[in-house]
A protein has these predicted regions:
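A short acidic-Thr-Gly-centered motif at the start of a beta-strand
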Residues: 157-169, 202-203
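Conserved N-proximal alpha/beta basic substrate-recognition cap immediately N-terminal to
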Residues: 27-41, 49-159, 178-179
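Extended, Lys/Arg-enriched charged tracts that mediate electrostatic binding to polyanionic substrates
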Residues: 65, 161, 176-182, 188, ...
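Short acidic/polar capping segments at secondary-structure boundaries
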Residues: 93-94, 176-180, 215-217, 243-244
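A structural signal for short, well-ordered beta-strand segments and their strand-loop junctions
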Residues: 4-5, 48-51, 87-90, 172-174, ...
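Phosphate-binding site of ATP-dependent enzymes
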Residues: 195-244
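N-terminal-proximal low-complexity accessory segments that begin disordered
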Residues: 1-47
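Glycine-rich phosphate-binding loop of ATP-grasp-fold ATP-dependent ligases
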Residues: 146, 170-195, 222, 245
Length: 245
């Protein structure tokens, strides 16, 4: 059986990379409020990890309306599902420890070495290669020119000169791992001390960050894909949302 877990702090936890990571209160609240989100994409016969107190009635209503073949699993019940295949929103050392402590068999969880490889694949820096590919092949309706990776040995002085020379309209710095609108530093008024401090922290903590122009965007959306783990990748839909910036 598959057990789905909604952990919206997944990318932030990857940035921290510690098994005892604790997300900010607002993100923890989001995880609680949206714990049943996986019922809409879980495979039939699966379980969804969520507190029962205020989720059971809602799930029952949705099951009646949409004939959803999923059931609720609470944290205290995890030992009864020790042999499940955990399907989190995203893997990181913290969710691995949480599942292991809850009673899931270790053989059903990714190894620390596998998590290290997963972390590197999840970094924003990997997206730069795709952007460059789209740009070099002149694929219509894509952007990517002007985006770059700043690494630890570059220093903030080089970053400052790069901004002055290339980003007349300002730029945005992005942590290699972050989520829910976190990990961004907007540089609209020059390389100020606050911007410099942010860059220094990012270089110290993650040894790099992504820098890109502030695009004249129309709206925000993400493309969602599913990988079966055997080389097959499927496009499953869009995630459209609204942001302040």
């Amino acid at each position: 059986m598959k057990l789905y877990v909604f952990n919206p702090d997944a990318d932030m936890a990857l940035g921290n990379n510690e098994e005892n990571y604790m997300a900010p209160a607002t993100i923890r609240r989001m995880a609680e409020d949206l714990a049943l989100l996986p019922i809409w994409y879980a495979r039939p016969g699966s379980g969804v990890l969520a507190p029962s107190a205020y989720n059971a009635d809602y799930l029952k209503q949705m099951q009646q309306l949409f004939r959803l073949d999923v059931h609720l699993v609470t944290e205290p019940e995890l030992p009864d599902y020790a042999d499940v295949r955990v399907m989190p929103w995203g893997w990181n050392p913290a969710i691995r420890k949480r599942m292991l402590k809850g009673g899931v068999l270790e053989r059903n969880l990714p190894t620390p070495d596998a998590l290290d490889k997963y972390r590197m694949k999840a970094a924003r820096s990997n997206a730069l290669a795709f952007r460059a590919l789209f740009y070099s092949n002149k694929i219509d309706y894509t952007c990517g020119d002007g985006c770059c990776l700043v690494e630890a040995d570059g220093g903030t002085t080089a970053i400052s000169l790069d901004i002055i020379g290339r980003y007349k309209e300002g730029c945005v710095f992005k942590s290699l791992w972050s989520g829910s609108g976190k990990g961004l530093c907007w540089c609209r008024h020059g390389f100020t001390k606050n911007v410099s401090d942010w860059c220094s922290r990012a270089l110290k903590e993650n040894r790099g960050f992504v820098m890109e122009p502030i695009f004249d965007k129309v709206e925000d959306f993400a493309m969602e894909f599913y990988s079966d783990g055997r080389g097959k990748l499927l496009f499953v839909g869009y995630s459209r949302f609204v942001t302040d910036d």
